[in-house]
Amino acid sequence: MEVGSVLFFVVIGLAIIALAVFFTFVPIMLWISALAAGVRISIFTLVGMRLRRVIPSRVVNPLIKASKAGLGITINQLESHYLAGGNVDRVVNALIAAHRANIELTFERGAAIDLAGRDVLEAVQMSVNPKVIETPFIAGVAMDGIEVKAKARITVRANIDRLVGGAGEETIIARVGEGIVSTIGSQTDHKKVLENPDMISQTVLGKGLDSGTAFEILSIDIADIDIGKNIGAVLQTDQAEADKNIAQAKAEERRAMAVAQEQEMRAKVEEMRAKVVEAEAEVPLAMAEALRSGNIGVMDYMNIQNLTADTDMRDSIGKMSKEDDEK
């Protein structure tokens, strides 16, 4: 009796393990849900997904939604997109939204957009409801030197045919900013821009800025416009300051050259004085030699001494008169 009980429990345990393994590899509830929704899927197909490491619910549930929406999508297409790393549920939702909005979008196109890293569902929604992109303040300078700042609102619609390989929102903002700057810069007076800001949007819109992008520009509206700095006056002030600094540098250079020349002349004067002193020191020797050789007499020597004394006296009187005049 005990052996029979043990055998019974062993059989029950093996049966439970077998059922657990069976339900792990065979998603019966998912298969029943698909049958209830009218989607015919072989149970062996679901088992094959398990073996290929595909989560069956990630493929079957979107297939049920696509079938209910009337889309002719096969399970092989969805599984292939899943194995490629795509978001199956998002692609199916985008196809359903495009089908409801009468937008032509095939599964291959939607899968390619999804694998390219674009949000295909958002693209379909933007095709139905255009998106508004607001730019920051963009500054341009008119010909009169006044800075004008403008903020624009760009209404764009997604172009599904150009989503793969097309430029994004940053390119749209950059191109519109470039158009605003060039339009403001072409005006002779900033007042014309303030009086007619619509001129900016019309000029920019006519340049075909959406070429090569994933969007179609519907409208460009100037949301705000403001006056900035007087760039012309600032540039003139900077130029005047630079000219002043250059003039000061040149004046300082000339002053330094004058000081150097003055010092050089003083050095030359001292050099000449030294030569004079040196020459004066040789005069007594020359006179002694002249007296010794008989070239001059004693009376001649006395006359020279008298002339020297008279000269010294006149120099002294001249210096005294000069000092009195200065006082």
UniProtKB/Swiss-Prot annotation:
Where does this protein reside within or beyond the cell?
Cell membrane; Membrane raft
Keyword Acyltransferase belongs to the record: no
Record-linked InterPro entries: Band_7, FloA
Q: Give a GO cellular-component term.
A: plasma membrane
Instruction: Describe its membrane topology.
Output: Multi-pass membrane protein
Induction conditions: Expressed during sporulation stages IV/V, part of an operon with downstream gene BMD_4542.
The UniProt transmembrane annotation reads 6-26, 28-48
Which keywords does this Swiss-Prot/TrEMBL entry list?
Cell membrane, Membrane, Transmembrane, Transmembrane helix
- What is its quaternary makeup? Homooligomerizes.
Q: What does it do?
A: Found in functional membrane microdomains (FMM) that may be equivalent to eukaryotic membrane rafts. FMMs are highly dynamic and increase in number as cells age. Flotillins are thought to be important factors in membrane fluidity.
The family line of this record is: Belongs to the flotillin-like FloA family.
This protein is called what?
Flotillin-like protein FloA
